[in-house]
């Protein structure tokens, strides 16, 4: 399946600390590498704990939260700053009103006002994106622009880091920016405009950009 569990994050934190030397992870399977990178970052672990406390269904912290951590690690950076917005996704067809997302964002700000939170119930986002209704949060991620963006993590009740990677982790760890299927076709220009706006290569020069 697309959800993988790792060893307990408390154990990982005893073994690893940020910055995490790439040589210590390069022989691990990619799911284990990702869990180790996230577990070694105290700020990201704090974010995951805040989100777990909400007890939302099918809920993940995704996109740049994961992507930039891995890219920074592979660029041998000493630390990985959080993205401007921390993308929290969840899936519940019974609570599709945008006001519910706004209230969840307010709860997260009360928990940690130093962070910028963005909460989106993926059960309604197909309307915004012009797609068929999504079935799960992972299904929604398959309709995001890049394969390396379509990845989420969360903390289980047991403190394990779980990974949702419906399109796999290969591109993320190969430093490849590649459009997903929809963004190779009718949404290709959206992908190209996003590349121009993000200017990722300026921050991560080892990236290989696929133009679509």
Where are these regions (language model features)?
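Catalytic cores of the polymerase beta-like nucleotidyltransferase superfamily
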Residues: 15-212
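Extreme N-terminal basic, low-complexity initiation segments
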Residues: 2-11
């Amino acid at each position: 399946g697309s959800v993988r569990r790792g060893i307990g994050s408390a154990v990982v934190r005893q073994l690893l600390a940020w910055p995490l030397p790439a040589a210590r992870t390069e022989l691990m399977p990619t799911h284990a590498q990702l869990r180790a990178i996230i577990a070694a970052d105290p700020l990201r672990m704090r974010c995951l704990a805040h989100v777990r406390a909400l007890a939302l269904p099918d809920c993940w912290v995704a996109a740049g939260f994961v992507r930039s951590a891995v890219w920074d690690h592979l660029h041998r950076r000493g630390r990985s700053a959080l993205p401007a917005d921390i993308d929290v996704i969840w899936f519940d067809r019974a609570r599709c009103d945008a006001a519910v997302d706004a209230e969840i964002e307010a709860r997260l700000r009360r928990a940690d006002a130093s962070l910028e939170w963005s909460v989106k119930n993926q059960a309604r986002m197909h309307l915004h994106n012009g797609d068929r209704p999504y079935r799960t949060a992972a299904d929604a991620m398959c309709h995001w622009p890049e394969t390396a963006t379509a990845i989420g993590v969360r903390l289980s009740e047991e403190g394990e880091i779980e990974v949702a990677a419906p399109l796999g982790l290969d591109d993320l760890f190969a430093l490849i920016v590649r459009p997903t299927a929809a963004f190779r076709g009718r949404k290709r220009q959206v992908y190209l405009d996003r590349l121009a706006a993000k200017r990722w290569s300026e921050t991560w020069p080892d990236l290989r950009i696929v133009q679509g």
